Every structure is written in structure tokens, then in C-alpha cells.
């Protein structure tokens, strides 16, 4: 296959991913674990609801709300669809003063003319924007290995503020054309971090981050972790619909629900590191988001629920969904007597079920529950 064909394949694949997310049920068949996390209701909150402050600080910036619009797309065929999605999300992020990411910029690195599909500064001059490259592209065994040049291009071409490195071994392992070269990625990221002038966020894409991986990432200076846990969109599920043969379909189906649930991943990363956490993975309501914040996350990240209005260019539709989450978070905070996110991390939590069973075998659960702040 020639170079041109490989470039086109990347762009076409991005379009197929969007299409399947919109038209198919690509949700995990299991929950993200937050049903096992319980707030203790306070009949006397001792605060006024309208005094609750939802602002958070992250990588030197202050944001009005603890919600992160997760990266979804960019570089799709014709670029128009991806551009519309990203600009719609960016307008919403600009209005609410919350951060957002773009989808993988691999297509842009290969075909620079697709850069406009990621560019949102014309509609969102102040938004905190996170670029996005894949971890396998930094492997020592991959052809056309990425380094400082590509990382700078990803950030500076779209005037981003930080770079996410997405770790998606599950998706790549079940994708027909997947990149399964991961040897030497940690060393490459350590070298990149030593030279790179922007923050780097390590990001999973639906299978969660364990405390072992989190500790390694913290040791090389990574600035934050997006846990991207199990319980939301299954990228193995997406690849099931893209598979070309029965073996490929069977493989993707078998691993549809592989991974670490989001709630568990948040707890492990918070227990083992002092890094800021973005809790993505099946975040579909403000109560679950408030639980993630109480467990130590700085943001709850959301993607798929915003995709349908974003495809239509419906900025108000995106904002409406986000405002619903915001009000649900605020209400949960009121009912546990938390004036701000810092206080929310100190309210009592009760963890039950599978999540408790897992965490009791993996961490000192009582110690974690006593100290959930950064």
C-alpha cells in the first residue's frame, strides 16, 4: 500500500468512527462503577445552594465548571464534518469557560491540509485547547516515529495549550489496521517531556488507567491523567462494526468490555499519585460526575452525549446538555454540604459492591477515603 493510500486510510477510518458512534450502540455492556459510590445525604447542609462555587484550577488556568469536553474528532474525509463538530464544541466551551480537546491529529500530521478541521481559535479565542497524538506513534519500533517536531506541530498548528497522548492498546489490538507497537513509549514520552514546552496529558480511551501505569507516568513528569475508563463508549465495540471478517468481529466482541471501570481507575490514580485527574468513561449525569470529583478528579470528561448536537452544529444543544450536568453537580454538592470542589473531596463516601471488592485488593481503601485531595 502506497503512502497516499495510508494517509487516506487514516482519514476514512476517522469518518467511520464518527459514523458508528452516531448510528450504532457502541456503549460498554457494563457500568462505569459509580453506582457503587454513595454520598451520605446531609439533612442540614449548612450552606446556601446559590453560594456553591464550581470553579476548578488546572495546569495554571481557572475554569468556571469541572467539566472537560473530551477530544472526539478531526481530519475526517473532506474535513467539513470534523470541523463543524470541533467548532460547535469550542463555541460551547468558550461560553462556559471549560476546556476541550480535539481528536487524534495523526491525520493532520500526515495530511497537513486537514489542519482546519481541528482549528477553533476563530470561534473560541480563549478556550483551553488540548491537542492529541497517539502513544504508538512514539514507539521505538513503529515506522515514521513521532518526536518533538510532530508534538510541536500538533500543538502550535492549532494554537493549543497542551497535548494529550492517547493510550489505546485495546482499540489498536482489535483494529484491522491497528498500530500495536508500544515498545519504548514511556522512554520516548520521558524524552519528549524533557524538551516539550507545553503540558502533556496522558489519556486512555475506554479501558482505564491502573495505578501502576499512573505511577510510571508521574515519574517521567506527565502533567495530568485522563483515566478514560470502562463504562462508556467501547472502542472495541466500534471496531466490531468495522471488522472485515468473522475472526476480527469475534475478537472485538470478546474484548468489548475489557478494562478498568472509570470509578475504580479514578480511585487507583488518586491513591497512587498526586496528578490532576480527568474522569472520562460513561459520564452521563451530574451525580456520577459529582462522585468522580469527590473521589479526587479535577474534571469529569464527556464526549458521546455531545456528539449528536455537535454534528448538527447545534451549539445551544451542546450547552443545554452541559448546563444540565452543571446543575446536577451543584445540586449534589448542596445535598452533601460542599461549598466547592475542594470541600466535596472531604465529604463522606461509602463504596460498595464490585468497586469495593476490587479496591480492597488493590489499595488501602480506608486511607484513600480519608485523603482524596491532590
Swiss-Prot record:
GO biological process: isoprenoid biosynthetic process
Keyword NADP: yes
Gene Ontology molecular functions: FMN binding; isopentenyl-diphosphate delta-isomerase activity; magnesium ion binding; NADPH binding; oxidoreductase activity
InterPro entries, sorted: Aldolase_TIM, FMN-dep_DH, IPdP_isomerase
Binding site for substrate: 13-14, 104-106, 171
Coiled coil start-end: none
Catalytic activity, EC: 5.3.3.2
Cofactor: FMN; NADPH; Mg(2+)
Entry binding sites for FMN: 71-73, 104, 132, 203, 233, 282-284, 303-304
Gene3D superfamilies linked to this entry: Aldolase class I
Enzyme class: isomerase
Localisation: Cytoplasm
Keywords: Cytoplasm, Flavoprotein, FMN, Isomerase, Isoprene biosynthesis, Magnesium, Metal-binding, NADP
Main location per the UniProt record: cytoplasm
GO CC annotations on file: cytoplasm
Matches recorded under CDD domains: IDI-2_FMN (cd02811)
Record: residues binding Mg(2+): 172
Annotated catalysed reactions: isopentenyl diphosphate = dimethylallyl diphosphate
Subunit structure: Homooctamer. Dimer of tetramers.
Its job: Involved in the biosynthesis of isoprenoids. Catalyzes the 1,3-allylic rearrangement of the homoallylic substrate isopentenyl (IPP) to its allylic isomer, dimethylallyl diphosphate (DMAPP).
Family: Belongs to the IPP isomerase type 2 family.
Name by which UniProt lists this protein: Isopentenyl-diphosphate delta-isomerase
Native source organism of the sequence: Thermococcus kodakarensis (strain ATCC BAA-918 / JCM 12380 / KOD1) (Pyrococcus kodakaraensis (strain KOD1))
Amino acid at each position: 500500500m502506497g503512502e497516499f493510500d495510508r494517509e487516506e486510510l487514516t482519514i476514512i477510518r476517522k469518518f467511520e468512527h464518527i459514523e458508528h458512534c452516531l448510528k450504532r450502540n457502541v456503549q460498554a455492556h457494563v457500568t462505569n462503577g459509580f453506582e457503587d459510590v454513595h454520598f451520605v445525604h446531609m439533612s442540614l447542609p449548612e450552606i446556601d445552594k446559590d453560594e456553591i462555587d464550581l470553579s476548578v484550577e488546572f495546569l495554571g488556568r481557572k475554569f468556571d465548571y469541572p467539566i472537560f469536553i473530551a477530544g472526539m474528532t478531526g481530519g475526517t474525509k473532506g474535513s467539513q464534518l470534523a470541523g463543524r463538530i470541533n467548532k460547535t464544541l469550542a463555541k460551547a466551551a468558550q461560553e462556559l469557560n471549560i476546556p476541550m480537546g480535539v481528536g487524534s491529529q495523526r491525520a493532520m500530521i500526515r495530511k497537513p491540509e486537514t489542519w482546519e478541521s481541528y482549528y477553533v481559535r476563530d470561534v473560541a479565542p480563549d478556550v483551553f485547547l488540548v491537542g492529541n497524538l497517539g502513544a504508538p506513534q512514539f514507539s521505538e519500533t513503529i515506522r515514521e516515529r513521532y518526536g518533538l517536531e510532530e508534538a510541536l506541530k500538533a500543538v502550535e498548528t492549532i494554537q493549543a495549550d497542551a497535548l494529550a497522548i492517547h493510550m489505546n492498546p485495546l482499540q489498536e489490538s482489535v483494529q484491522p489496521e491497528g498500530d500495536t507497537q508500544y515498545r519504548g513509549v514511556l522512554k520516548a514520552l520521558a524524552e519528549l517531556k524533557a524538551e516539550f514546552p507545553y503540558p502533556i496529558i496522558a489519556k486512555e480511551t475506554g479501558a482505564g488507567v491502573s495505578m501502576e501505569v499512573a505511577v510510571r507516568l508521574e515519574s517521567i513528569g506527565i502533567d495530568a491523567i485522563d483515566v478514560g475508563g470502562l463504562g462508556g463508549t467501547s472502542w472495541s465495540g466500534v471496531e466490531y462494526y468495522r471488522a472485515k471478517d468473522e475472526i476480527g468481529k469475534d475478537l472485538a466482541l470478546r474484548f468489548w468490555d475489557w478494562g478498568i471501570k472509570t470509578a475504580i481507575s479514578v480511585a487507583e490514580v488518586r491513591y497512587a499519585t498526586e496528578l490532576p485527574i480527568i474522569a472520562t468513561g460513561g459520564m452521563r449525569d451530574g451525580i456520577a460526575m459529582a462522585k468522580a470529583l469527590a473521589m479526587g478528579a479535577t474534571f469529569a470528561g464527556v464526549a458521546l452525549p455531545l456528539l449528536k448536537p455537535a454534528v448538527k452544529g447545534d451549539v445551544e444543544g451542546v450547552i443545554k446538555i452541559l448546563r444540565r450536568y452543571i446543575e446536577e453537580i451543584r445540586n449534589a454538592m448542596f445535598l452533601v454540604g460542599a461549598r466547592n470542589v475542594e470541600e466535596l473531596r472531604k465529604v463522606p463516601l461509602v463504596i460498595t459492591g464490585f468497586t469495593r471488592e476490587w479496591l480492597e485488593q488493590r489499595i488501602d481503601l480506608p486511607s484513600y477515603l480519608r485523603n482524596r485531595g491532590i
